[in-house]
């Protein structure tokens, strides 16, 4: 599968999202604050903020926490964050992109490098792996939104480029600059999406064995547990039989 990755679902099944819930909230709040500070504090007038708020609602972040994050952006004490992308290779040459938002670039660079080194990878330079990914918009719907044909037709009408559907849902892809436009068009036909965000979509994925999957999960867990890291993306997939052993 070229786009949607099953390992995200594996993380859900392992209960990882519950463990990282508070950390996830703080990262989403940071994105909301930065988006609001860079543009208008009204989500309807600020596409990036609208997506950030949508992502927060998707994981049931309380409304007052969202509003507090927006309000923080308008105060003089809002931190200045730098958005830095790191690229490297994990175990067995799997390409990994790490997006960070930090108030201390030296600290973040040192930490990210140490995670790669500790878990069998190596940090590269900017551009060393991103050419193997496409920067696109990803809009997610649950299976109840409709069958594959219905969603495909709606996506084409909305201006999307690609759709992937399976028993777990629908993933609709579009150009990175047209995410809000396509998302709004889809909502008129399919209702509100579960999630809409910019992602790094691998052009190709490598199926990994159990040993590699275990090593990759350790690296990804370490990265995602760092407060400065916002997203981690790899060009791999975990076959169902390997996933079952990971869950065991």
Curated annotation (Swiss-Prot):
This protein's UniProt keywords: Cytoplasm, DNA-binding, Transcription, Transcription regulation
Mind telling me which SUPFAM superfamilies this protein's record contains? YebC-like (SSF75625)
What segment(s) does the record annotate as region Disordered? 1-21
Q: Which GO terms describe its molecular function?
A: DNA binding
Mind naming one GO cellular-component term on file for this protein?
cytosol
GO aspect biological process, one term? regulation of DNA-templated transcription
**HAMAP family associated with the record:** Transcrip_reg_TACO1 (MF_00693)
Task: List the NCBIfam families.
Answer: PRK00110.1 (NF001030), PRK12378.1 (NF009044), YebC/PmpR family DNA-binding transcriptional regulator (TIGR01033)
Q: What is stated as this protein's family in its record? A: Belongs to the TACO1 family.
Protein name from the UniProt record: Probable transcriptional regulatory protein RHOS4_22610
Say which species the protein is native to: Cereibacter sphaeroides (strain ATCC 17023 / DSM 158 / JCM 6121 / CCUG 31486 / LMG 2827 / NBRC 12203 / NCIMB 8253 / ATH 2.4.1.) (Rhodobacter sphaeroides)
